[in-house]
Amino acid sequence: MIVKNGYVWNGTIFEKKNLYIENGRFVPYSDTGPVVDATGLFVMPGWVDSHAHIIGTGMKVLTHDLTKENLFDIFKKIRESSENFIIARGWESLPEQQILDKANELKIPVLLVRKCGHVAWINNYLKEKIGKRKDENNLLFEKEIEKVWNFLGDEFFSKAFEKGQEEFLRHGVTQVHSDDFHGVGFETLKKLLKNSKIRIFEKLYTYEPWNYEFREFGISKIGGIKLFADGSLGGRTAWMVYPYKDTGGFGMNTLPDNFDEVVKFSEQRHIQLNIHVIGDRALAEVLGRLEKNKVKLRHRLIHLQFVLKNDFPKLRNFYLSIQPHFYFEDIPLLDNVSFELAYPFLQMHKSGYMIAFSTDSPVSPADPKYVLEYAFKMGFTREDAVYYYTEAGSKIAGYQCGKIDIGYCADFALYDNDPFEENPVAVFVNGEEVMRR
């Protein structure tokens, strides 16, 4: 393939040049294959989202978005629709009791998921279906929510996967480090990965990794193990050193009982751990446990919103998936917590740590421009921000992608306007066109 006359991002500026592609990679020269006329178009490496949820992003498209819809309207229309399971996501504070009472009157399952995805409310009908007692709370926290996903079925998850892919590709994202193993069957997940248009590094959420395959599936691979050390800040389940001012609680420790066993397995098999840590107490616990296990691999930590000063230097030994926009989204929540370091992402950059940007979609939009806007506000330069959203993310997954250069994966996008303001007109993954607007 030849991509002719495009303005190609070289890491600093756009320069006019031709690109040559063979076997899914950029090569010095080729005169075979199709010719893509990129005259007047900008050519960017495909964005790499180092932490998101493809199925979750698709579910947001297929279900109700509480930032755009009203629950009363949703319940009112239910009699006129064929909907037999109401899933709505996006609440910050629990809906009023009057609305919850309305949900409890319905004889179909109702699941209302908080924006963060770590807390959910279920109606009485669904509570009975998953085996909770009548006198138990209708709120579900963390791993409890997994019981509900098992009701949805693989056909639904397959549709959600397709919608999620479309959403990322629409924004020029060609690689996602995804966390999808929630309810979907493993055989179905393997098929989805094998046939994916997008390059996926799957972080398999399991406490029993020895029961699963870690290998390549098409252009994608199951390459990491996903674990949670705590929950979310807004849900008051992030595990903190100092108590939450409104509840007096410290959050939740969600590390599995067999954490050390999983660590040893990952070290023996050379599989990357991907550990969700938001609170400073969660991070301190994880760092201590990994040190105790004398890990030799460079594992990955995700989020890192609060860090103890003594723990900050230890982060040099890990890959760090961060979300600059979370600081700005979480400002209303910060008065409720005490901390030493909060969202020290620019400090990580200045210290030379191995960081990569991500959206955590569907918690936040799947659009890289959204993340970049807040990265610039935080103080990152355009050049550094692009690097952390392309090549850096690819490196921490073991791929040679995210850069338009000889030997790199031919994952790129074409834009007819400023790539930092508009979506692409076409997207290519592994040298194949996968999206055209």
Residue ranges and their predicted role:
Residues 13-15, 220-221, 420-422:
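Short, small/polar residue-rich loop motifs at catalytic or cofactor-binding pockets
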Residues 2-4, 9-10, 14-22, 26, ...:
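Divalent metal-binding segments
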Residues 192-195, 214-220, 264-268, 294, ...:
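Acidic (Asp/Glu)-rich catalytic clusters
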Residues 113, 178-181, 203-205, 223-228, ...:
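Generic beta-strand/beta-sheet core signal
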Residues 267-273, 288-299, 323-417, 428:
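His/Asp/Glu-enriched, well-ordered alpha-helical/loop segment
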Residues 53, 219-237, 318-327:
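Non-cysteine beta-strand/loop elements that form the S-adenosyl-L-methionine
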Residues 195-226, 298-305, 309-310, 333-347, ...:
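Phosphate/diphosphate-binding loops
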